[in-house]
Each structure stands twice: as structure tokens, then as C-alpha cells.
Amino acid sequence: VTGVQTCSLPILTPVFHYGYEPFFTKCEEVGINGIIIPDMPYEEKGELNDIARSHQVDVISLIAPTSEQRIQKIAADAEGFIYLVSSLGVTGVRSEIKTDLDSMIAAIRKVTDIPVAVGFGINTTDQAANIAKIADGVIVGSAIVKMIAKYGTHAEQHIYTYVRMMKEAVMTANK
């Protein structure tokens, strides 16, 4: 719908209680054009997706390691971009990514050319560079949250330096 620029990542319960229509009206008003709801099963996104579309908001699909058939089913219906989950389990920093991302991206590419961004545990420049070689984007979240927890009100410079290093790793990998 929009070529996602600004995303929000809420859990489903507050969105449901607030109401889909008022929630997506507010998203449109403030310029959020993509939403990732990590606890919403793919099979349950129908009604929410219709309302989101009416407000120019893409519901971003998450694809976790699963069968090729399910990967392709979710990918064929995706909009904005695909959030490819790098590992099973809870989010957070991981020392290594063991999932066969190449095969998952190949399965996605059989049904769509929508951008694929990989996240879930990405925290080192080496991980970011390696993922940037095969995916369209790299998502880093928990590592930044940990910096905020560690440095509090003094986190800004640490985050800036970290994000700059991650960006350089991604840009270098894409040359």
C-alpha cells in the first residue's frame, strides 16, 4: 500500500481494546504507515488488515522458521515488507544465527519480490553484514533496548555510535 516508512510494534491486546478503527485512524493521523503485531496469528489478520488498509497502513507479516509451504502462503499475502524472524524463541541478543535464512528467503522469492528484513537477535556488526548480503534489511531492537536499560538518560551517544557501526556494516556488505 504505502512503501513502509514508519512502523509501530504493539501487541494485539491494547489494539483490540482501543478498537481497530480508532487505532488505525490515529496511526494515519500521526503518519504511521506500517504495523507489526508479533502476537497476532497470520490466520487472524483479516478484519484488522481490511481496516488498516482503509487508513493506508500496511500490516507487516512476520515469518518464522517453518515449512516452505507456510512461508510462501504468508509471503504471498504480505504488504509493506516481510519481517523474517531469524530464530525460534523469544527475541533478544543471540551470539549466532543458526537458521537457514538463505532457504527461507529463496522460498519467499518464489512468490513475491516484496522486501525482506531479518530481525530477532541481531546485535553484532558481523551478523548485520552477513544478513545484509542476502536480505533487503536488518532489524535491530533488543540490543538497543539493552543499551537504554544500561545507560538510561545517557544512552543517546551509545545508541548513536552503535547504530552508525551497524549501518556501516550493512552498507559495506552491500557494495
Predicted features along the sequence, with ranges:
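Short, small-residue-biased leader/transition segments that mark boundaries at the very start
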Residues: 1-9
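Active-site beta->alpha loop and helix N-cap motifs at the rims of alpha/beta catalytic domains
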Residues: 8-37, 168-173
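Active-site-adjacent beta->alpha loops and helix N-cap segments on the catalytic face
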Residues: 15-22, 37-54, 67-73, 92-106, ...
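Conserved, mostly hydrophobic/aromatic
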Residues: 27, 74, 108, 131, ...
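Glycine-enriched alpha-helix->loop->beta-strand junction motifs that scaffold or abut catalytic
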Residues: 27-33, 53-59, 77-84, 134-137
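Surface-exposed amphipathic alpha-helices with a cationic face
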Residues: 28, 49-53, 102-112, 163-174
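Glycine-rich phosphate-binding active-site loops on the catalytic face of alpha/beta enzymes
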Residues: 32-36, 41-44, 84-92, 121, ...
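Catalytic cores of alpha/beta
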Residues: 66-76, 118, 122-138
